[in-house]
Amino acid sequence: MQLASKWVLAAGTAACLLAGVSASQAQPTIRVGWTIPAEESKYWMMRRPAEFPDLGKTYNVEWTQFQGTAPMTQALAAGALDCATQAPLSLANGVVGGNLKAYIVAQHVFEKPGGFSVYWAVKDDSPIRKIADLKGKTVGISVIGGGTYGPFAMLLKKNGVDPEKDIKLVEVGFAVSEDALRQGRVDAVNMNQPFAAHAEAKGGTRKLFSLSEEMPNIVHILEACRADFVDKNPDLVRAYVRDITLGMKKALANRDETLKVVSEVLKAPIPVLDTYLLKDNDFGRDPGAAPNFEAIQKMLDIYHQAGMLPKMDVAQFKHPTIVAPLQ
């Protein structure tokens, strides 16, 4: 597998990047990877720690930001992170290419019928009118091999475009997607919230295709922890998952405060966030941050049928007791 061939170097790099973090602290510490957007429970923990009885009192979190899920998979496999945001495909690739053993302990967001679906945009005056027109073009994606790559690649192949040969695929973080498109650095680029809302309000871009066209009800991001870390520190991870559960409840119960929290993390204006966040046109969220293992299994099966993964059973990612919601 092409992605797997990069694991030794990538995982070693991840370990070096985080090796300087000291583990000698009075309270037990979890090293957690995060990204943007759509991790409201973790944003609450980061920006409103006083709202969580255990956080900073019985345990600490060392937060490290990444551009996407694939680099966090590498860091987990290298032992440089204990828990991190993951997508089903990136986590599965970690198992295949990095011998990663992990538990899915919570879920952040999924695509729901009628809600937001990650999409690829082009400029209004672009000659690109359909997916087949992407041949020979430069296309931006947040992270190659990350959560959006699977359905993106499948959709292109279905329309006669080989994502490895027919396009120039470049990594463009969600936060700079709009600028990359408007400045002509890419011909098409992925859009996620709140950056999609900002681009749509400004005008001059149009949707080419969305991931829901290939894979409805995608589980986009979940929370995973290294199995060895969980098995060695079950009470510590339980406390963390309790706070993930509580963070999701707080995010959904107090939208006004959540708008402020997300604005602080994403540096996005509240009026932009207010157009979609926690509304019908947003992603879906389970109120208890519970993972939808059935939906994740369906995604793994689809990736297997597409030749992207070996056959994989989601049961390997289930811990018998440490999984959201935890009270």
Q: What residue spans do the PLM features occupy?
A:
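Bacterial N-terminal signal peptides that target proteins for export
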Residues: M1-A11
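Bacterial N-terminal signal peptides
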Residues: A10-G20
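Sec/Tat signal peptide C-region and signal peptidase I cleavage site
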Residues: V21-A26
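Short, glycine-/small- and polar/acidic-enriched structural segments
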Residues: Q27-V161, K168-E171, D187-Q193, N217
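Soluble non-cytosolic domains of exported or imported proteins
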Residues: F66-A70, T85, S142, G146-G147, ...
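Pocket-lining segment of extracytoplasmic ligand-binding domains
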Residues: L89, G98, E164, L169, ...
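Secondary-structure end/capping motifs
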Residues: D231-M308
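Conserved C-terminal helix/tail region of periplasmic/extracytoplasmic solute-binding proteins
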Residues: L300-Q327
